């Protein structure tokens, strides 16, 4: 509440008019510092303040991280791709909530494979290839923290991931990454696409075999009466 104040005579100091006590008014509630939960970080419901007097009226609560929910091997929450297949083109995107996108791949045979990306929208992307033993969600969580710090302060370090096996930022199409690597049969690898700085966007990725190791089958020899087959 409040008080209107007394009216005082400047000459004699007498109270000319008594003030009135005011009843407290209703707070104008505003919720601040809301944070959405994702597959990698917890959320926050936000603190409630009075937008008029700026008093905090209520504390918010932490909300748990989301679970990866897969449908056709794609997480419905974050877009993460599990069990990526050879010669299949996947379209995905990064956002401010999910600045890094994960593609899991298990090599069907020993051999050389290429992870080739194309930026569909105009942004500068980075690609990282991880061996299974060096990758977990904490890698992405650390990257998100760097990304958010860079968004808040342009002078902060670029949001580079740690622990990767190989990385690239230019050998795909439209400033997208492409990485070629010798992989082991039945080993799992993780290819991660993320921002060079703070720009996010849409991209496609295709994993192919480079056919560096070949052999010939079905060869037959020709003579004067019958043809042959090169195999």
Residue spans of the language-model regions?
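Thrombospondin type-1
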Residues: 1-83, 211-231
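Acidic, Ser/Thr/Pro-rich low-complexity intrinsically disordered segments
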Residues: 94-212, 223
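Residue-level detector of functional hotspots within protein domains
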Residues: 34-36, 91, 185
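Predominantly extracellular/luminal regions of secreted and cell-surface proteins
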Residues: 83-93
